[in-house]
Amino acid sequence: MNREILVHVDLDGQPVFCGRLWTRSAPRESASFEYDVAWRTSRRGFALDPELPLAAGPFHTGRPIFRAFTDPAPDRWGQMLLRRAERALARREGRNPRTLTAVDFLTLVDDETRLGALRFRDAAANGGPFLSTGGTRVPPLMALSKLLAATTRIIADEETDEDLALVLAPGTSLGGARPKASVKDSDGNLLVAKFPTASDEWPATRWEATALELARRAGIHVPVFRLALAARKPVLLLRRFDRDGEARVPFMSAMTALSADDNQMHSYLDIVDALRREGAQAAKDLGELWRRLVFNVLVSNTDDHLRNHGFLHDGIGWRLAPAYDLNPMPTDVRPRVHALAIDDTDPTASMDTVWEVAPRFGLATKEARQIAHEVAAVVRAWRSAGKKCGLKPKELDRMESAFEHRDLAQAAK
């Protein structure tokens, strides 16, 4: 089936028409996009994707959809929810479930909670509501226990239709594989709630909170976060950094910025190049990125792939988004080898390699070593930070190999 989608970008709280997206499902999924002339010639207009430069089109791709539209689409958790919902609907209607396409995943996501500032309308609806609008609204914090219970049943493949209805709208818009949902606090701020699961080998939400606390102390920009208990289990709450009050902030993952695919090896130096090319304050953000590189090596946050780095558009250009998805990893589960190479080719955690690439970040040796020393001094207090986040002595011991290693001692010198 062919579809035409009207693409809007929210700027200062108002949707601005940006262009048209055409998708085709046969003989295989593909897409085309063309900017609206007004957007392309406006001072406020910007390219959604390096593969979609701000120029006359149309542009075509043999991929199911352009990378710019994969960022606001669901990842594994959200896709699983949408497939479950389609199965339930097909069962009620007495038919086989249909295969959801890339544009289905994109447009079935709840509009209120969709990542970033892109919004979509169906051209055939002649200016109808944004996709997808309606249904269950974003639940309040007081619904955490219900959301946790529903996600637990969904993971066990024992959910009811009511469970899907509760989780579908707030849960489909967020990336990653961990169960999560959007909720609102008493001030109306949009939050991400990350839930623990029965299969967690350690208290994952408490450890992520610990890593965020260490990063914050180390001078790294992180979202506002806290732990809350739901049914006596720790839920990690993070304020959405792609929202400024009610206004949406454009977001682009490093995966999109580099026109990359999951099966390709990339490096921190590729992100450096992207910041130099597209950044509104490249020098400042390169210093921040260097600090994050040191931190990731010292806490063994090895799952630092390109989807776990992102950029926010500030009206002038792209800025490094706050750090997110920070998760220490013990060496008996995974060696200290990062998803991204530190230099051009080597992903092995090593402060020796980190020192070597410092000039690529625009840092003199003295400044680079001072930053590393500051980060190391904070990371050395990982046990006290973990205790503050509710981790027990045995749980702290379980993660010791992620923190106590030669690189920490070397960075602290």
Residue ranges and their predicted role:
Residues 1-306, 310-413:
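Phosphate/dinucleotide-binding and metal-coordinating scaffold of catalytic cores
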